[in-house]
């Protein structure tokens, strides 16, 4: 794996919000083990690209906008030269703990608590892999015990620049709005980080999206 110098930041999506910082990584597609895996098995990984930048987003979700109870967990955006990945960070961390522990010859009892804690940090969420050369994304999801995969063209949002600036972690951010798949969103982006990407399926602004939320949040 190539060592890469990455920067640190925190951001905000969805029905709710997202957050980020960074280190080194490669954009990977984790293949989840079946429920009845053997303890000696490691998780198969395919390296698609090497991350040039990565951002951790803290997602906040409510079942309905009026619900006072919200769920929060980390998601990770990895940006490479050809691909980008958007994953549930808790599940990715749990997979890393599993792999490292199995390779080190540990018994399940030796790492179960750490692995379980990482899993508990997150909620089931979709995994996205963007192939920018082909202009498509692959989505992997799981509902209960059923696993789903679909491919679609990378969505292109139509953005409207709006008045108003903000500062997020020292970065000057600008406001933009869009309507995407039946919902209206407000986004903040910074031209100081020159990547036209963001959380989930959002992108296309002249800089990294640092915060996005649905207007009904």
Region spans (language model):
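Bacterial Sec-dependent N-terminal signal peptides
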Residues: 1-33, 37
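Extended soluble regions of mature proteins
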Residues: 29-217
